[in-house]
Amino acid sequence: MHTLNIKSTKELKEFFRYKGKNTPVISGHRGGMVKGFPENSIETFENTLRHTPAFYEIDPRLTKDSVVVLMHDATLDRTTNGKGKVSDYTYAELQQFRLRDPEGHVTDYKIPTLKEAILWSRGKTVLNLDRKDVPPEMTAKILTECKNDIIMITVHTAEQAKFYHDYNPNWMFSVLVKTEEAFAEYVAAGIPYSNMMAYIGPENKPENKILLDMLHAKGVMAMISAAPTYDKLPNAAERAENYRETFAQGVDVLESDLPIEVSEAINDRR
């Protein structure tokens, strides 16, 4: 298994620090989407790590009885053999359902809890918690209970980042930064450069160079998400070329539904 051997928050910050010429970093969007393996499942996280080192963007959601599970959609219909809203079921009731793979086939895998995922990730990878319907206070409490600070939290505003930073100054953030002004707001809120990785959008545009240079000057890595763009290209060769080009243009982290493909693409040309 290709693990990310990160043992402390100091090592976590060092891993995500821009150092001039970085090794490309791969983020599996919802863990990755491969036949036989459902999104947002521990089994999928493990499968991806069999092929490539990666960290994962995941989607925490609340059940009816306030258990936090992993589920992107507000409803069960697309990714499980259940129907209706996640929030209409207790955690115990959700255990009757099984997850579907990207092609819609029902697997043997159950819906995991956020706690299960965080505890599993220790010594293996980093989980990046996206924002869904879980109150920040509850997220912070669960992270504290799990005693695993080797995590990342997606935030869309400086105010959101400040809440978590005040709660635990060790936590890393994936910050939404599409302009220099947006980045300045995080800095003004007291978020250290070392606690940030910047998500700059779904494609690498020429006008991003100024933003990339500014982030890199502060030691902050920049991430592009290929899920809504390059991942949708019709064939593997086109996708591979765009993955390689994204890194060649200075992006440090590529988030993708197809992390194994990304790894194969960039390793073919080294």
Predicted segments with their positions:
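Phosphate-group recognition and catalysis centered on beta-loop-alpha active-site segments
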Residues: 1-270
